[in-house]
Structures are given as structure tokens and as C-alpha cells.
């Protein structure tokens, strides 16, 4: 679903921020 994809992108960026 579009919402799922958007959430996935949001989570991906959040994880990157956490690692960085």
C-alpha cells in the first residue's frame, strides 16, 4: 500500500539517523 511504502521510507531514514 502507498501508506506502507511511505512508512517504510520514514523508518529507513529514522534508522539511518540513529546509526549516524
Swiss-Prot record:
Keywords noted in UniProt: ATP-binding, Glutamine amidotransferase, GMP biosynthesis, Ligase, Nucleotide-binding, Purine biosynthesis
Keyword Signal: no
A GO molecular-function descriptor: ATP binding
Highest taxon above the source species: Bacteria
Keyword presence, ATP-binding: yes
Catalysed reaction, written as an equation: XMP + L-glutamine + ATP + H2O = GMP + L-glutamate + AMP + diphosphate + 2 H(+)
Uppermost EC category: ligase
Induction, as annotated: Repressed by elevated hydrostatic pressure.
Chain ranges of the GMPS ATP-PPase domain: 1-20
Pathways involved: Purine metabolism; GMP biosynthesis; GMP from XMP (L-Gln route): step 1/1
Enzyme Commission identifier(s): 6.3.5.2
Subunit: Homodimer.
Function: Catalyzes the synthesis of GMP from XMP.
Name of the molecule in the record: GMP synthase [glutamine-hydrolyzing]
Organism: Fructilactobacillus sanfranciscensis (Lactobacillus sanfranciscensis)
Amino acid at each position: 500500500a502507498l501508506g506502507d511504502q511511505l512508512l517504510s521510507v520514514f523508518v529507513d531514514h529514522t534508522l539511518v539517523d540513529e546509526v549516524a
